């Protein structure tokens, strides 16, 4: 009953327009362009956060990584790339480049490892968090980028991560190695083992697979000295 609106038929027609009963028409508004214009951070931006540097860039781009590192050589790589497992959190968070096909994913990893290796000191060590299901691609790319694979450490979590597998995952492997162009350095004792027990974060609304800080601090302490430079071109899963 139009009378209930307080307007007569002519007033409603003028208010709603002549096409009010027609189909909705697509306008020329470019949502992608508007979002890019509104974005606070742009590709190529390098932010100084205390003693740290954070870049919005491409881990496979020699130009981007060079812009970040300049003439500085990292003493250590501690990186947490996409695992290639199409991860999606319960809240809907996903990870970019986490759903590549086999050969494409290997090429992606190789290129990113090569970029990091170019800015690592001679004999510099590297730790790479990864998924067992993509272990072959990670190991092959790691070795092909010039690293010696010295071992694989295991992060044992305090609780399982519920997923689609028959056996629920309660660990993550971490490749450990170093560049073969020089002597690598070790700053801990000979009692450290390949099994790392650290509780996993309870929740992080900003990143679906963040690592606990004490977990990351452990290999950093073993493989660098105070004021060492640690590089992760994948943003440290929101941690480093």
State the predicted function of each range.
Residues 1-240:
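Core catalytic lobe of class I
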